[in-house]
Amino acid sequence: MEIKVGNIPQLKWAGDALAIGLFEDAIKLTEDAIELTEEMAELDEMLSGTLSELIKETEFKGKANSSVSTRVGIKTSIRKIIVVGLGKLEKFKLDSLRQAAATCGRLAKKERCKTLGISLPMCQDADSTAIAITEGIELALHQDNRFKSEPENLGPDLEKVELIGLAASDEAIAHARKICSGVIFARELVAAPANSCTPITMAETAQTLAKEFGLTLEILEKEDCEKLGMGAFLGVAQGSDLPPKFIHVTYKPEVTPRRKLAIVGKGLTFDSGGLNLKVSGSGIEMMKIDMGGAGTTFGTIKAIAQLKPDVEVHFISAVTENMVSGHAIHPGDFLTASNGKIIEVNNTDAEGRLTLADALVFAEKLGVDAIIDLATLTGACVVALGNDIAGLWSPNDNLAAEITAAAEKAGEKMWRMPLEEKYFEGLKAMHADMKNTGPRPGGAITAALFLKQFVKNTPWAHLDIAGPVWVDTENGYNNQGATGYGVRTLVNWILS
């Protein structure tokens, strides 16, 4: 699909479908007529009143993400007109554009259009507007048919999209498409079943990325991890027949980096719960998504490798399965992490934090300026914030503010949560330094406090993405399935 800036005025554009946006408060209906803006009135006149008739007959109100469409007369340069609601003007932001563009793209494809002109109002500046619209279109139209013997025939592909009347640069569109390639890469990793996405294939994927983009790659095998004392990670891994892979990919700019960062993604390619087996109704069949943090990490690798910022970034994932076997760790076992902390495993289904513990210790030893970890870590976070919002924990206000700003720009919802030190009392063990789980209340907070024990001095933040990593139904520019949540936030943070 080609996406480009169209310098042609709205009234002179020719193609299959023209999509326009209307604010909720901009439509004034009377019994006899509709009051339109000057530009809309000119378009309506060109279409012989089709636009005003469509709005009136459908009682279109301009509510966010609502849409209507109709064919127009054969004497015009377009076949169809699409009207998408932008909601209230005072709530209009970049993500409103993404949502509107997604609605336009899906409807144009449903209407079997091959060319689409999009005329939406500007937000912030022309390039930011172009980036948001491009992201909305690209992500909404992504289809993952890898595992279907006969992919559904969803109609012809949209071949060309023009952003009409927008003085944006081609570089802005290229920038957005590079980011989208990372989001889609993450989506497809997370959506793949556990017999397709394994620790071995994740390592192979890292090798492919490193080779394609000239990145530095280090893969630590089980023996290497043993030498580094990664007892927490290896304790989880010992129940699986598949070998664990500790993956470290480094992007280094050609110039002296202005900053060194680390991103750590939880990489459980399948989580059975271990001997604390997940029971019926627990969603065990969905535990392929427990490598969502690693999926986001890998997606960010792909985007950053193409964008080439002047920042050095280390991408780390301790990848394994959490399985049931005669070799699996027992509830009550003690594990020694690579910083010497001894952990009592009181629940084998709280394994992600064990793998992250050694990964965080490894990351800090690299001498980076800041660390972010991402993980589908707790159901408690989903209970607290729902399926759309990730939890953010950090003892560093500046880092938390940076991440929050990056997420706002990306339209990825996030909420800062407390690191209540008093709650660590619930993690204290009788004969070890700590347990891996605490009391049920505040479970997402105690999980973050557990991770905090493995970062000494480096600014650090933890993102619990258990909710937004997956959607069961189409939602905005996210299709049913894996969302690639976090890639755009991380890219914005790295570039900031």
From Swiss-Prot:
Superkingdom of source: Bacteria
Keywords, in A-Z order: Aminopeptidase, Cytoplasm, Hydrolase, Manganese, Metal-binding, Protease
Segment forming the signal sequence: none
Cofactors: Mn(2+)
EC number(s) on file: 3.4.11.1, 3.4.11.10
Manner of cofactor binding, per the entry note: Binds 2 manganese ions per subunit.
UniProt cross-references to InterPro entries, sorted A to Z: Leucine_aapep/pepB (IPR011356), Macro_dom-like (IPR043472), Peptidase_M17_C (IPR000819), Peptidase_M17_leu_NH2_pept (IPR023042), Peptidase_M17_N (IPR008283)
GO CC terms, sorted: cytoplasm
Enzymatic reactions: Release of an N-terminal amino acid, Xaa-|-Yaa-, in which Xaa is preferably Leu, but may be other amino acids including Pro although not Arg or Lys, and Yaa may be Pro. Amino acid amides and methyl esters are also readily hydrolyzed, but rates on arylamides are exceedingly low; Release of an N-terminal amino acid, preferentially leucine, but not glutamic or aspartic acids
PANTHER family referenced in this protein's UniProt entry, alphabetically: CYTOSOL AMINOPEPTIDASE, LEUCINE AMINOPEPTIDASE-RELATED
Family: Belongs to the peptidase M17 family.
Known function: Presumably involved in the processing and regular turnover of intracellular proteins. Catalyzes the removal of unsubstituted N-terminal amino acids from various peptides.
Name by which UniProt lists this protein: Probable cytosol aminopeptidase
Naturally occurring in which organism (per UniProt): Trichodesmium erythraeum (strain IMS101)
Gene (name only): pepA
